[in-house]
Swiss-Prot record:
Catalytic activity line of the entry: L-glutamyl-tRNA(Gln) + L-glutamine + ATP + H2O = L-glutaminyl-tRNA(Gln) + L-glutamate + ADP + phosphate + H(+)
Region Disordered, annotated ranges: 1-20
Gene: gatD
GO MF, one example: glutaminyl-tRNA synthase (glutamine-hydrolyzing) activity
UniProt domain Asparaginase/glutaminase: residue ranges: 80-413
Protein name: Glutamyl-tRNA(Gln) amidotransferase subunit D
Native source species: Halobacterium salinarum (strain ATCC 700922 / JCM 11081 / NRC-1) (Halobacterium halobium)
């Protein structure tokens, strides 16, 4: 029996039977049924029997009978233009019918169809830079991404939204923060939970990211849930953000500073307009139009990040011989076992730039307080202040390829990576 999206159906394959609403599928070879629980299930059409229980039980967005390409939002001269750049990740994911796992396979146009709430907020241009899960991110893709952002801004984009997997989003946001001088907002967003889950955060994050991209904050930032509720998203500076929870929707935090601002979802969900809705900005920020577009995307890939722990074998550091740079996550103020000092000194003598950060995250490195720290400074270690370890790695990759004096650059606040004063601890 023929069934259309929106029909309530019972699908039987083998000994299994599923009942729910048929929804549009990205493949003609598979059916997607939304169960009453809110989850989606994918079924191979080759061995499935379909019974229509209620025709047109619900209205399904995008069910026009036309090819998917016909769902593109029409251009409106009164609206800003936002470039949507997809790199993959959960926000652009669906069910892998081979395994039942979630796989990233939507391109930017699919995101528009999947999030109809984006319609009317802006004109959109979509492009795919990569289609990967973010654990497969590479520095070369950061360079491709920076080039794509530059091209979109040069073509007239009023803002850019980058769809990205959350696991390594902080690294990519840091990379573009160092690579780009941008006159418009560049907003990273993603989803902790895929679209087939009732608790998915993809729609709210995407809507808030587009509103942020229409705002006056011309920086690279991350837009994700600020709380577990669907109330507002936080805007985190790309060099001060860190994913601090594996699965919560509010997994991202600004560390050692306060967020650039917030996007109120209720306000953003009201009738779409050309102006940014629901965006409040807190503190100093680069304003739209202040900077002239420039890209410095060269990177030195031979940089390692090493976390010191008690009992760490000296061979782990010795294995970094030949690397252009090493960032160490030290304890407290920036310490390692005193037995490692000579190995670190040998790395420096051989031309490796060694940078010290703290695994404490809050506070800053100061190797002038204790003997161990002073010995590290004498060995040539560069203090990175309160730069986050992951950010320090990306910054060192960038500094070694672009700065006249990389060591000095690591002690300067490029793109807000290093604050001038750590926040006092408050309960």
């Amino acid at each position: 029996m023929t069934a259309d999206p929106g029909d309530r159906v019972r699908v039987t394959h083998g000994d299994a039977s599923h009942e729910g609403v048929l929804v549009p599928s990205p493949s003609d070879d598979h059916l997607v049924v939304k169960l009453d629980s809110g989850y989606n299930v994918g079924v191979d059409t080759a061995d499935a029997d379909i019974d229509v229980l209620d025709a047109d039980a619900v209205t399904v967005d995008g069910d026009t009978g036309e090819d998917a390409a016909g769902s593109t939002v029409e251009f409106d001269d009164d609206l800003p233009t936002i470039a949507l750049i997809s790199t993959g990740g959960t926000i652009a994911s669906t069910v892998d019918y081979r395994t039942g796992a979630v796989t990233a396979q939507f391109d930017a146009e699919d995101v528009l169809r999947a999030v109809p709430d984006l319609a009317g907020r802006a004109n959109y241009r979509g492009r795919v830079v990569a289609n990967i899960l973010s654990e497969n991110m590479e520095p070369s893709i950061w360079q491709d991404l920076a080039a794509a952002v530059r091209e979109e801004i040069e073509a007239g984009a009023d803002g850019v939204v980058v769809m990205h997997g959350t696991d390594t989003m902080q690294f990519s946001a840091s990379a573009l923060s160092f690579m780009l001088e941008t006159p418009v907002p560049v907003v990273f967003t993603g989803s902790q939970r895929s679209a087939d889950r009732p608790s998915s955060d993809n729609v709210m994050n995407a809507v808030c990211a587009v509103e942020a991209a229409k705002s006056d904050v011309a920086e690279v930032m991350v837009c994700m849930h600020a709380t577990e509720s669907d109330d507002r998203c936080a805007l985190h500076r790309g060099t001060r953000v860190r994913k601090t929870h594996t699965s919560r929707r509010d997994a991202f935090e600004t560390v050692g500073a306060t967020p650039l601002g917030y996007v109120d979802y209720d306000a953003a969900s009201e009738a779409a307009t050309a102006d940014a809705r629901g965006v409040t900005v807190e503190g100093a920020h680069a304003a739209r139009g202040d900077a002239t577009l420039d890209v410095a995307s060269a990177l030195e890939p031979a940089v390692e990040l090493v976390k010191f722990t008690p009992g760490m074998n000296e061979s782990l550091l010795a294995a970094c011989e030949g690397s252009a740079g090493v960032v160490i996550e030290g304890t407290g103020l920036g310490h390692v076992h005193s037995d490692l000092t000579d190995t670190i000194g040998s790395l420096v003598d051989d031309g490796t730039t060694v940078v010290m950060t703290s695994q404490c995250l809050e506070g800053r490195v100061c190797d002038r307080v204790y003997d161990t720290g002073r010995d590290l400074l004498a060995a040539g270690v560069v203090e990175a202040g309160d730069t986050l370890p992951g950010t320090a790695k990306v910054k060192l990759m960038w500094a070694l390829a672009n700065a006249d004096d990389p060591e000095a650059a690591m002690q300067e606040s490029v793109a807000g990576a290093l604050t001038t004063q750590s926040r006092p601890w408050t309960a």
